[in-house]
Regions:
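Short, surface-exposed charged micro-motifs
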Residues: 90-92, 170, 197, 248, ...
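Elongated, acidic membrane-bridging lipid-handling scaffolds
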Residues: 146-265, 322-371, 378-384, 471, ...
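Hydrophobic residues embedded in beta-strands of well-ordered beta-sheets
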Residues: 101, 203-207, 230-232, 256-258, ...
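Extracellular/lumenal and peripheral-membrane lipid-interaction modules
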Residues: 34-89, 162, 461
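Flexible beta-edge/linker motif
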Residues: 41, 47, 62-70, 91-184, ...
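Extended terminal
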Residues: 2-45, 273-275, 406-495
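Transmembrane beta-strands of outer-membrane beta-barrel pores
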Residues: 145, 266, 288, 314-316, ...
Length: 495
C-alpha cells in the first residue's frame, strides 16, 4: 500500500471516530439538557478535532521520501555547522517530546577523510513548516557515542566549531571519545567526552563551549569563547589536583600564539607558547617567586618527542613530589606510561628550598617505551659528598608513588661527615664510597635500603640497621632521627 493511500485511510478513520463520538453523545440527549450537552460536546469535539489535526500535522514527516530526508538534512547541517555528514539508510522520525530525526551509524568527513563515527545522531527540528522537507528548520543537534579521530592537521576541530551559528539551536556531544593520533594508526592519547555543549548566549551575544572530559583517568572541565575574531579564551579546571588554567590563544595564519596563567593552590605561574604545524614550544616563568627562573619546553609532533630544560636559583622538591603536587598526581594517574611518549627533563638548581645542606642539583628524568626514570640525577651535600642516581624507575604501587634505584655516594671529606653527625672519634673509620639499592615511597615517606656497600664491601649489620628508614613530618625530628640512625650504622661498621 502506498503512503498516500495509507494517509487517506488514516483520514477516513479520523472521520469515523468523530461520527462515532457524535452518535454516542446524541443518543444520550433529552429535551431538558439538549442545549447544555450540545454546547459541552461542541467544545469537547472541537478540542478533539484540533488535537487530531495537530497530531496529523506532526506525523507529516513520516511521509517524506527517505532520500529527500537524507539529502536535505545533510544540506542543512552543512549550512549550520559547516560539517560534511554521511548518513546510513537507518533514519527514524518521532514527534515526542519534540519533532526530531534519529540517524544511526553516521559519519563526519573533512578533506575527504573520516573525522568521526557517530552511533546516534539526533536532529531536533522546529514545529514550523512540516509540510515540506525543504522548509523544515534544524534546531538542536546531539551526537551520542561518537569517536573522533584528530591529528596535527585537524587538531583544532572543536575550536573551529565554536565559530558556527548556534543562535537557533545548540550542539551537544555525549559519551564520546577523542583519539589524538600521531600517524594514521598510532594513538598518542585518548580523551573522553562526558558531555559537551555549544550554545549562543543572548546576553553576552557570543557562542560558548562548555565540556566535561577526562584524560589519562583525570577529569577536567573546560569553558571557551571567542574574545574577538582571532582570539579565544579558555578556562580549564582539574579539580582533582586543584589546578586551574586561564588561557588566551591568538590565531596568526599558520601559527598559534598563546599565554596561560596557571594556578595550583596558591602558586601562580605563566606560560607563553607557540604552536606550529608539527611543533609546540613554550617558556615557563615563575615571575613572582623567582623572576629569573625559566623553563624552556619543546615538543615535536612528527616524530613525537618532547624536552624541558630549566635553570633555577632554588628548587622546591615539594612542588614536584609532594603528596599534593601536580606532577606527583599526574604520575599516579600513569598518564606517562605510554610507549608513544618520548620525553626528557633536565633541571639545574643551585639550592634546595628549606634545605641548606644540599646544592648544585641536576635533576634528570626520561620517559621512553612507557618507563620513567631519573638516571644521572646528581646533587652535592655541601663539599662533603657527591650523590649520583642510576638504574632508577618511577612507578605506582597500590595507588602510591614509588622510586626504585641505585645510589652512589663519593665521599670527599669523611671527617666532616663524622663532625656533622657528632660521631665519637673511636668509630671514625675512613670511608671513600658508599653504594646501595633503595626503594622510596613518596606517600608514606619510607625508604628501604638494600645491598649497602661501604668501599665496595657489604656489611650485614649496617644493612640490618638501615634497611627501613621512616621520615618524620617535622624537619628537626628528621635530623635527630638520621643522626642517631647513621651513628648506629657507623658504630656497627667500625666494630
Amino acid at each position: 500500500m502506498s503512503k498516500t493511500n495509507f494517509f487517506l485511510k488514516y483520514l477516513k478513520n479520523i472521520n469515523n471516530l468523530i461520527n462515532n463520538l457524535l452518535e454516542k453523545n446524541l443518543n444520550k440527549l433529552n429535551f431538558k439538557n439538549l442545549s447544555f450537552l450540545f454546547k459541552n460536546n461542541k467544545i469537547i469535539l472541537t478540542f478533539v478535532a484540533l488535537f487530531i489535526i495537530f497530531i496529523s500535522y506532526l506525523i507529516l514527516p513520516t511521509f517524506y521520501n527517505p532520500n529527500n530526508i537524507s539529502n536535505e538534512l545533510k544540506k542543512k547541517l552543512q549550512k549550520k555547522l559547516d560539517l560534511n555528514f554521511k548518513f546510513s539508510q537507518n533514519i527514524e522520525y518521532n514527534f515526542f517530546p519534540k519533532p526530531h530525526f534519529i540517524i544511526r551509524d553516521s559519519k563526519i568527513f573533512g578533506n575527504q577523510k573520516e573525522i568521526s563515527k557517530i552511533s546516534k545522531l539526533k536532529i531536533n527540528i522546529s514545529f514550523d513548516n512540516l509540510f515540506s522537507i525543504k522548509d523544515i528548520k534544524v534546531k538542536d543537534v546531539v551526537l551520542e557515542k561518537a569517536n573522533f579521530n584528530l591529528n596535527t592537521k585537524n587538531y583544532n576541530f572543536f575550536i573551529e566549531l565554536l565559530s558556527k551559528n548556534f543562535k537557533n539551536g545548540k550542539l551537544a556531544i555525549k559519551d564520546s571519545n577523542v583519539f589524538f593520533k600521531h600517524f594514521e594508526s598510532e594513538v598518542l592519547f585518548i580523551s573522553k567526552i562526558f558531555k559537551m555543549k555549544y550554545y549562543f548566549d543572548s546576553k553576552e551575544f557570543k557562542n560558548f563551549l562548555y565540556s566535561e572530559n577526562e584524560i589519562f583517568n583525570m577529569p577536567f572541565s573546560i569553558e571557551s569563547f571567542f574574545i574577538n575574531k582571532n582570539k579565544i579564551f579558555s578556562q580549564i579546571n582539574f579539580d582533582l589536583i586543584k589546578l586551574k588554567i586561564d588561557n588566551e590563544l591568538i590565531f596568526d595564519n599558520e601559527k598559534r600564539i598563546g599565554k596561560s596563567k596557571i594556578t595550583n593552590n596558591k602558586l601562580k605561574r605563566v606560560v607563553e607558547y607557540q604552536i606550529k604545524k608539527n611543533s609546540f614550544n613554550f617558556d615557563f616563568f615563575d615571575k613572582k617567586a623567582q623572576p629569573k627562573a625559566i623553563y624552556i619546553g619543546k615538543f615535536n609532533l612528527k616524530p613525537f618527542f618532547g624536552s624541558i630544560e630549566g635553570n633555577l636559583d632554588e628548587i622546591n622538591l615539594n612542588h614536584l613530589f609532594g603528596s599534593n603536587a601536580v606532577i606527583a598526581q599526574l604520575l599516579k594517574t600513569e598518564i606517562f606510561n605510554n610507549k608513544n611518549i618520548n620525553f626528557n627533563l633536565n633541571l639545574n638548581a643551585f639550592n634546595v628550598h628549606n634545605n641548606s645542606n644540599f646544592k648544585n642539583i641536576n635533576l634528570n628524568s626520561k620517559i621512553q617505551d612507557g618507563l620513567i626514570d631519573t638516571d644521572n640525577t646528581k646533587f652535592e651535600w655541601r663539599d662533603i659528598a657527591d650523590f649520583k642516581l642510576s638504574d632508577s624507575l618511577i612507578f605506582v604501587r597500590n595507588g602510591e608513588l614509588v622510586l626504585d634505584g641505585k645510589m652512589k655516594i663519593n665521599v670527599n671529606d669523611y671527617n666532616k661527615i663524622y663532625k656533622f653527625l657528632l660521631t665519637p672519634k673511636i668509630y671514625r673509620s675512613q670511608i671513600k664510597q658508599i653504594d646501595f639499592n633503595f626503594s622510596y615511597n613518596f606517600d608514606q615517606k619510607i625508604a628501604e635500603l638494600k645491598e649497602i656497600k661501604i668501599d665496595k664491601k657489604i656489611n650485614q649489620s649496617v644493612n640490618k640497621i638501615l634497611n627501613n628508614v621512616i621520615l618524620k613530618k617535622d624537619d628537626l625530628r628528621n635530623k635527630i632521627y638520621f643522626k642517631n640512625l647513621l651513628n648506629d650504622a657507623i658504630k656497627s661498621y667500625a666494630g
